[in-house]
């Protein structure tokens, strides 16, 4: 349990804050143990595993009862969450009769009473349902990306195989959940796109076409620069979850000092090879080692339709990364990897350098303004484009936001209001800290702005937001 001292004044040292924490996470299917004495068969995965068997059965039984009870009132949409003083339970049925449940402990403030005994206060209203329901859905999407559906595991090897896959995946994945840093971006699950001029975009398009022609077994390609997406041949929903995996898991594991020029040591091991910075992030570590293993992660896409299994090859040069996806029935050889390296490496290095140069020119032209008076989050539901100046960096372990958590909660509350109505609308809130928070929903797009202008009035705030829309989103139509 991590605690942080907070507060001001005399009692500050006595007050401790504990962020939300994962208490339990389980997956069950009520059809697998319908008779008395067979209840344990329903449980497919349970964390923490040390929990005594009868308690597991009791907790799953309680969830079943809650779902059944809420079905009475809403047959098509049963329980999504249950609020109690100490925790919040979230329910998700991603496939028929397969239920996932996540129990999160509410944040705690521990104070010292007059007689010196600790008094625990649960912050019942701090957690946002939509944020943690989205986190639970992400858990399933990430499992499905690397393992396929629950049903497919049942078809391939019955309950035994499904349990093995769930254990193997979630045992590791749950350790990467950092519930204290989840926020509005988890609801959107969007993709940050890299801003590019037409000429450079065409160069990238032409590079992808050349690569797909040279490496004919490549089925899909995705191109990223600086952890932002430029091009993808995958369906949106598949790219969205692959993007999350790349930016929060794979890339952070391979962080390298950005190459500032061409003065770093250049790889030129292979005779006649053009000098380049390319390397595999998945697959063989050393292409010169004849024993090198060419194992690539397997991913599953289009699971509702054609159900494709693919090998994921991620290759990087400087800040540019390309994902090549090939049919899983084809096993890439070391020769193929060497060929890919010799074709892609030099061209990707030059391209990465071009993008960097172009980006710096554009940056200089737009001029580095002083710290603006506002921060914003933008999301487009149609193409999943997301942009945030609120987040300095979103890493797997921490979401570094440059604003107070109270303001992040207001953003979440505004988003919940937007969900309840279909019409376009605007909400303006003045926070206790004198910040102004504005939410705009217009034509499948959402914009959230935080303004640091204590003495501004409503009209002035409205004008500021209009100015922001004109400068940052000049080609996007926002209804007034």
Swiss-Prot record:
The modification N-acetylalanine is found at residue 2. The modification Phosphoserine is found at residues 74, 264. It is found in: Lysosome membrane. GO terms for molecular function: guanyl-nucleotide exchange factor activity. GO terms for biological process: vesicle-mediated transport. Keywords: Acetylation, Guanine-nucleotide releasing factor, Lysosome, Membrane, Phosphoprotein. The keyword Endoplasmic reticulum does not apply. It holds the Pfam family Intu_longin_3. GO terms for cellular component: intracellular membrane-bounded organelle; lysosomal membrane; Mon1-Ccz1 complex. Interacts with MON1A. Found in a complex with RMC1, CCZ1, MON1A and MON1B. Acts in concert with MON1A, as a guanine exchange factor (GEF) for RAB7, promotes the exchange of GDP to GTP, converting it from an inactive GDP-bound form into an active GTP-bound form. Belongs to the CCZ1 family. This is Vacuolar fusion protein CCZ1 homolog.
């Amino acid at each position: 349990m991590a605690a942080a001292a907070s507060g001001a004044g005399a009692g500050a040292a006595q007050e401790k804050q504990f962020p939300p924490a994962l208490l339990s996470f389980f997956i069950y299917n009520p059809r697998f143990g319908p008779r008395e004495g067979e209840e344990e068969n329903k449980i497919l995965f349970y964390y923490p595993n040390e929990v005594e068997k009868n308690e597991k059965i009791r907790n799953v039984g309680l969830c079943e009862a809650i779902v059944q009870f809420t079905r009475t009132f809403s047959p098509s949409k049963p329980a999504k969450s249950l609020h109690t003083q100490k925790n919040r339970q979230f329910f998700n049925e991603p496939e028929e009769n397969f239920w996932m449940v996540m129990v999160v402990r509410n944040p705690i403030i521990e104070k010292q009473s007059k007689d010196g005994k600790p008094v625990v206060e649960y912050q019942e209203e701090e957690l946002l349902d939509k944020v943690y329901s989205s986190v639970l859905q992400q858990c399933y999407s990430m499992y499905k990306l690397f393992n396929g559906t629950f049903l497919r595991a049942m078809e391939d090897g019955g309950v035994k195989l499904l349990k093995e896959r769930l254990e193997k995946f979630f045992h590791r994945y749950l350790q990467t959940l950092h519930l204290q840093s989840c926020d509005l971006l988890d609801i959107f699950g969007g993709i940050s796109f890299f801003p590019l001029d037409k000429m450079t975009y065409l160069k990238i398009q032409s590079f992808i076409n050349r690569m797909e022609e040279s490496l004919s077994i490549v089925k899909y390609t995705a191109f990223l620069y600086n952890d932002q997406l430029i091009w993808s041949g995958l369906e949106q929903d598949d790219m969205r979850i692959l993007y999350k995996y790349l930016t929060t898991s794979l890339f952070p594991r391979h962080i390298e000092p950005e190459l500032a020029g061409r003065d770093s040591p250049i790889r030129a091991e292979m005779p006649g090879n053009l000098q380049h910075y390319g390397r595999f992030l998945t697959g063989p570590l050393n292409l010169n080692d004849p024993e090198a293993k060419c194992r690539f992660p397997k991913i599953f896409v289009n699971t509702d339709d054609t159900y494709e299994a693919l090998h994921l090859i991620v290759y990087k040069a400087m800040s540019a990364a390309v994902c090549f996806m090939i049919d899983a029935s084809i096993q890439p050889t070391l020769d193929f990897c060497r060929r890919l390296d010799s074709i892609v490496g030099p061209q990707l290095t030059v391209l990465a350098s071009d993008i960097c140069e172009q980006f710096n020119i554009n940056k200089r032209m737009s001029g580095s303004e002083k710290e603006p008076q506002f921060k914003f989050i933008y999301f487009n539901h149609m193409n999943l484009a997301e942009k945030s100046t609120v987040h300095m960096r979103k890493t797997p372990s921490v979401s570094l936001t440059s604003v107070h958590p109270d303001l992040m909660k207001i953003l979440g509350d505004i988003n919940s209001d937007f969900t309840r109505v279909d019409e376009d609308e605007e909400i303006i809130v003045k926070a206790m800290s004198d910040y102004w928070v504005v939410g705009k929903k217009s034509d499948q797009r959402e914009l959230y702005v935080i303004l640091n202008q204590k003495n501004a009035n409503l009209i002035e705030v409205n004008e500021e937001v209009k100015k922001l829309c004109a400068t940052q989103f000049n080609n996007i139509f926002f209804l007034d």
